[in-house]
């Protein structure tokens, strides 16, 4: 079985498709930034000024040859005019075979880039090729092509020990278009340019070509030789081929003999090899990497062979013979993750101690003809190239393993590179490690599987923080003046590598979600207090937008991802004190507008020319005005109206708030004022023109304002941040109030200021409507229909408390003072023992080791009641409750009604002007609500019977209500009804009717708690004193004695003594004649009392000697008559 090299595959560019950008830097196709040459290419001459570092991805678009912002005309000058020996074509061949183990698999062109024909094209010579030109036209091969190109072919191959399973194409090497156009020296023998250029190689290019897959473990004949052309880049040997002999001939072929019988020893011989890699099949294996340095080697130095073996295949008698090779690179999976050091070792030294090595890097001199700039960077290039090769070899190419293993390998490598980036210092830039790691990550992005959104965000955050946090170039150069030039070069290389990584990540997942995961980590850096950090962030954002416009692989019907935040942050930067930042931000907005306009026109199936569209939009949005950047802000906001929905308006407002955060003290006063002005203009204009679109997102806007206020301390900035509240409340009062009710409780200074903003700033809302909304919320139960606790009433009470602190609001509150007072008193009763959802706001001044005071909702509600009384001028009433302990009683379940009665009694005593209004409001409240509602209303109502105005109330609402209360199932309602009747009995016209109700009142005391009995009996004494002589029926007294008797043994001493005292007084009220029934009842009540006396209760005898004496005499009289 042999692989013939006679078949050629010709690659050409499809002009009908949008090519996929490579991983090199994208020039400012739509920006004013001049493309910088990539300094990482050490073996190719630098291009002339303006030569594209990325393909023009639209027939009408190409990089600006003058470095000017925006698309450029199609007539681009030939790069060869600069003197660079740039080839006009290149031919790439792949081997062809009839064996079933060789699988030519055409891969789809993912991004419309260099697309090979779907079928291999036989070629008897190397004269057929396609010309890659800026005009994307196909031309015949010219005569002036260098001979090295006309006679040199490159094989593209991939191995797979299991051809039946699709492969993720891990680490298939390729040449980017830039390398094909610029780096013609890669085809020369003894060239030192590696086939895989880490800084400008796009791994996804090979996905569109035919891939040769060779399964060396499927040979039927053990003696059959498998011939691989030197142009097959990768050949994987599965662990079934445990005995193999590798060698290379002068013709550049690799002969492999497979033995179907596995054995523990593996002997490998490699001669004239430029690149040999032994990749372990498990974490305990070793990696062997060889690089040729012989100038006159007959084998192309760009060839590569890879052995994949499981750890079980390695044994003590395994041997590896490598000849005509200068340097070996050895690494171990197990050790590499712990130690990233790289050491070199000449091949002549002893190779037996592999475990002591983790990597050997081949250092090579630059070839003749290399440019001076490339020579200056050769040292860093060598480090980078070999680091890249090392990481490549660490990644296993085991195609016969499960996809889960492949996923873990990529994840491990990504984490390794991220850790390497994190280890780099943030205050200096003296090592290319940061840049190299990002370039390796960029190439990893072309492998499967793609990163998840979370992983991509973490990766971007890590890289962006490492680069953006660096000091300014000037600061780093001043710190180390001797390396100023090196720092300058390395700095630009690092920024370029970061941009390449961002672009590569976008190509990895060219979806709205993928773009969002890249843009979101960049956004906050645009609001940095340091100029150089803002400049880097704006530049990166604009570059990503530029790249998106050129590529534009997706269409979003619902709008651009994170449009509001991105637009808002760029708008703020238009007003940046640094004019260059402002200018670039406006250019980024123009690109963003063009993307949105392009998608809109694409949806309408319109013919589009990106170049013309961009230029039109640039004129449409106007030039940058450094003297008055706010004019640019206003213009942009006005013109973006077609693309702003509710979510975008919300994000715009929140982005404006980000610009108000406390800025570094190093910023001058003028700079701070400029940035605050930009935020204010942005907020005001958005609210003025698009506030009607924010209706459905008002809760999110209010929450965002609350969160941002914690980071804004400057008074003027806080005023600006609170503007949306008053603006939105003037049009959407209900929605704003409902949103504010969701603020964490208890209200901190930020939440309180948001409530006050409703009436402090213009345009202010209607205070009358505001108070009515709060009153409505206060009338709700703090329990939902599903039985869950609701925070709305307590939040409404808190908001009312803050509004009462504004003097201008007090007069408006008086209008609904009675309703507010009654609603608050009822809410106090509802909140007793209520556990609300966990929405307690953390206190700024609370330390970690100090627990904040426990937030008790009922106490907060009582505080609001007290505040309302004081603001309404009821200071005497408040003081009265303070003296009587009423405020404490109000928060307790068993005594809440007593505190309400005390308050009503105090208001009557001090002649509160609002009592009549309260009286008439209470009448309908007595019929509504549940038990707590009725108890609170009744407790206040009965005390108002002391007023003269009660005569105006119909009897059915006074006396009739009290009579109904005597039969109520709640004992408290019975006690309150008795109190009401007693108060009514003080009026002569009511005395007779109340006297007739005395038996019912006494009877209602049965089976009642001793404390309530004491309270009711205390009220009944008034009636007994006034009507004692008129009562001839002793049955009422006997009923009272029967009621008091069970409480003689009450555990509470106050209850016992009070009932016995009352008992003695009732006995004295008895009158002759006595009936048999009365004597029996009297005897039954006196006997337990005598037992108490006999037990020698000194306290009882001491407190009530007269009552006991009277009762004893009466008892003797009864016995004598019997």
From Swiss-Prot:
Q: Where this protein primarily resides, as one coarse class?
A: membrane
Positions of modified residues (Phosphoserine)? 356
Q: Give the sugar-modified residues.
A: 200, 210, 255, 267, 296, 541, 546
Q: Where is the composition biased (Polar residues)?
A: 75-95, 120-136, 184-203
Q: What is the lineage of its organism?
A: Eukaryota, Metazoa, Chordata, Craniata, Vertebrata
The UniProt entry lists membrane topology as: Multi-pass membrane protein
Q: Does the keyword Isomerase apply?
A: no
Task: Tell me the protein's name.
Answer: Maestro heat-like repeat-containing protein family member 7
Where found? Membrane
| Alphabetical keyword list | Glycoprotein, Membrane, Phosphoprotein, Repeat, Transmembrane, Transmembrane helix
Q: Where are the transmembrane segments?
A: 548-568, 722-742
Which positions carry the signal peptide feature in this UniProt record?
none
Mapped HEAT repeat ranges? 913-950, 992-1029, 1035-1072, 1080-1117
Which cellular component terms (GO) are annotated to the entry? cytoplasm; membrane
For bias kind Low complexity, which ranges apply? 33-65
Name the segments for region: Disordered. Answer: 1-144, 183-203, 246-265, 363-385
User: Biased composition, Basic and acidic residues: where in the chain?
Assistant: 372-385
Which InterPro entries does the entry mention? ARM-type_fold (IPR016024), HEAT_MROH2B-like (IPR055408), Maestro-like_HEAT (IPR048465), Maestro_heat-like_prot (IPR045206)
Q: Which residues form a coiled coil?
A: none
Origin superkingdom: Eukaryota
């Amino acid at each position: 079985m042999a692989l013939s090299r006679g078949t050629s595959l010709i690659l050409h560019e499809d002009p009908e498709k949008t090519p996929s950008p490579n991983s090199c830097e994208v020039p400012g196709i739509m920006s004013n930034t001049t493309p910088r040459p990539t300094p990482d290419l050490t073996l190719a001459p630098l291009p002339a000024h303006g030569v594209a570092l990325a393909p023009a991805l639209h027939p009408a678009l190409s990089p600006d040859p003058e470095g000017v912002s925006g698309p450029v005309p199609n007539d681009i000058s030939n790069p060869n005019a600069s003197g660079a020996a740039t080839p006009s074509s290149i031919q790439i061949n792949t081997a062809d075979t009839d064996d079933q183990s060789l699988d030519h698999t055409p891969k789809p062109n993912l991004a419309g880039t260099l697309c090979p024909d779907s079928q291999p094209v036989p070629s008897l010579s190397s004269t057929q090729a396609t010309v890659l030109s800026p005009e994307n036209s196909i031309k015949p091969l010219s005569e002036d092509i260098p001979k090295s190109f006309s006679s040199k072919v490159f094989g593209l191959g991939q191995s797979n020990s299991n051809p039946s399973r699709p492969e993720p194409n891990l680490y298939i090497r390729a040449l980017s278009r830039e390398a094909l156009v610029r780096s013609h020296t890669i085809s020369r023998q003894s060239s030192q340019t590696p086939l895989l250029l880490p800084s400008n190689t796009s791994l996804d290019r090979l996905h569109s070509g035919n891939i040769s897959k060779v399964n060396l473990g499927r040979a039927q004949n053990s003696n059959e030789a498998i011939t691989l052309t030197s142009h097959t880049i990768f050949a994987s040997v599965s662990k079934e081929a445990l005995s193999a002999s590798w060698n290379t001939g002068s013709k550049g072929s690799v002969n492999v003999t497979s033995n179907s019988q596995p054995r523990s020893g593996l002997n490998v011989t490699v001669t004239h090899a430029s690149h040999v890699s032994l990749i372990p099949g498990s974490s305990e294996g070793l990696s062997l990497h060889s690089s040729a340095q012989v100038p006159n080697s007959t084998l192309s130095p760009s060839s590569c062979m890879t052995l994949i073996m499981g750890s079980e295949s390695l044994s003590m008698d395994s041997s590896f013979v490598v000849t005509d090779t200068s340097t070996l690179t050895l690494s171990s999976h197990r050790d590499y993750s712990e130690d990233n050091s790289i050491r070199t070792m000449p091949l002549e030294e002893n190779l037996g101690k592999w475990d002591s090595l983790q990597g050997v890097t081949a250092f090579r001199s630059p070839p003749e003809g290399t440019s001076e700039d490339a020579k200056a960077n050769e040292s860093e290039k060598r480090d980078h190239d070999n680091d890249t090769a090392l990481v490549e070899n660490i990644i296993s190419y085991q195609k016969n393993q499960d996809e889960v293993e492949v996923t873990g390998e990529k994840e491990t490598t990504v984490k390794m590179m991220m850790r390497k980036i994190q280890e780099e210092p943030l205050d200096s830039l003296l090592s290319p490690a940061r840049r190299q790691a990002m370039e390796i990550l960029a190439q990893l992005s072309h492998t499967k599987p793609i990163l998840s959104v979370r992983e991509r965000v973490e990766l971007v955050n890590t890289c962006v923080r490492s680069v953006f946090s660096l000091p300014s170039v000037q600061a780093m150069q001043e710190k180390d003046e001797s390396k100023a030039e090196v720092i300058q070069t390395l700095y630009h290389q690092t920024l370029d590598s970061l941009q390449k990584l961002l672009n590569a990540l976008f190509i990895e997942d060219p979806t709205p979600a993928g773009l969002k995961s890249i843009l979101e980590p960049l956004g906050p850096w645009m609001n940095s207090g340091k100029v150089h950090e803002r400049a880097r962030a704006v530049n990166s954002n604009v570059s990503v937008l530029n790249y998106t416009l050129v590529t534009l692989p997706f269409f979003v019907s619902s709008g651009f991802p994170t449009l509001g935040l991105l637009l808002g942050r760029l708008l703020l930067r238009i007003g940046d004190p640094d004019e260059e930042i402002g200018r670039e931000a406006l250019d980024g907005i123009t690109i963003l507008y063009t993307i949105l306009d392009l998608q809109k026109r694409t949806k309408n199936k319109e013919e589009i020319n990106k170049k013309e569209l961009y230029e039109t939009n640039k004129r449409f949005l106007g030039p940058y005005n450094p003297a008055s950047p706010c004019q640019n802000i206003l213009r942009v906001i006005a013109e973006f109206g077609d693309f702003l929905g509710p979510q975008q308006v919300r994000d715009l407002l929140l982005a404006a708030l980000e610009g108000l955060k406390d800025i570094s003290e190093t910023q001058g006063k003028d700079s701070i004022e400029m940035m605050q002005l930009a935020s204010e203009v942005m907020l005001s204009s958005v609210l003025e023109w698009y506030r009607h679109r924010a209706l459905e997102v008002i809760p999110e806007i209010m929450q965002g304002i609350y969160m941002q206020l914690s980071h804004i301390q400057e008074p003027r900035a806080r005023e600006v941040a609170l503007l949306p509240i008053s603006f939105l409340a003037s049009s959407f009062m209900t929605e704003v109030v409902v949103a504010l009710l969701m603020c964490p409780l208890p209200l901190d200074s930020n939440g309180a200021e948001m409530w006050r903003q409703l009436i402090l700033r213009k345009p202010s809302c209607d205070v009358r409507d505001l108070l009515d909304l709060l009153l409505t919320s206060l009338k709700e139960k703090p329990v939902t229909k599903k039985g869950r606790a609701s925070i709305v009433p307590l939040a409404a009470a808190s908001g009312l408390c803050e509004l009462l602190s504004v003097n201008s609001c007090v007069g408006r509150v008086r209008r609904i003072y009675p309703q507010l007072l009654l609603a608050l008193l009822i809410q106090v009763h509802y909140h007793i023992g209520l556990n609300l959802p966990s929405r307690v706001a953390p206190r700024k001044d609370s330390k970690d080791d100090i627990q904040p005071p426990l937030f008790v909702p009922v106490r907060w509600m009582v505080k609001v009641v007290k505040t309302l009384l004081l603001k309404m001028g009821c200071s005497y009433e408040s003081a009265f409750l303070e003296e009587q302990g009423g405020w404490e009683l109000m928060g307790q379940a068993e005594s809440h009604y007593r505190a309400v009665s005390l308050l009503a009694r105090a208001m009557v005593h001090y002649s509160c002007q609002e009592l009549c209004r309260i009286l008439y409001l209470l009448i309908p409240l007595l019929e509504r609500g549940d038990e707590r509602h009725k108890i609170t209303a009744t407790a206040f109502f009965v005390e108002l019977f002391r007023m003269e105005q009660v005569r105006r109330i119909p009897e059915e609402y006074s006396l009739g209500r009290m009579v109904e209360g005597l039969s109520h199932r709640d004992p408290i309602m019975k006690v309150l009804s008795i109190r009401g009747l007693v108060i009514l009995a003080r009026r002569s016209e009511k005395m007779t009717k109340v006297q007739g109700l005395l038996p019912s009142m006494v009877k209602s005391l049965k089976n009642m708690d001793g404390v309530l009995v004491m309270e009711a009996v205390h009220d009944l004494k008034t009636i007994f004193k006034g009507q004692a002589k008129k009562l001839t029926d002793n049955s009422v007294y006997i009923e009272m004695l029967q009621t008091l008797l069970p409480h003689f043994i009450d555990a509470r001493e106050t209850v016992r003594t009070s009932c016995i005292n009352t008992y003695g007084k009732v006995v004295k009220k008895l009158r002759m004649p006595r009936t048999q029934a009365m004597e029996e009842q009297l005897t039954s009540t006196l006997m337990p009392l005598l037992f108490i006396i006999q037990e020698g209760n000194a306290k009882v005898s001491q407190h009530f000697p007269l009552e006991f004496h009277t009762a004893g005499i009466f008892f003797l009289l009864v016995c004598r008559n019997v």
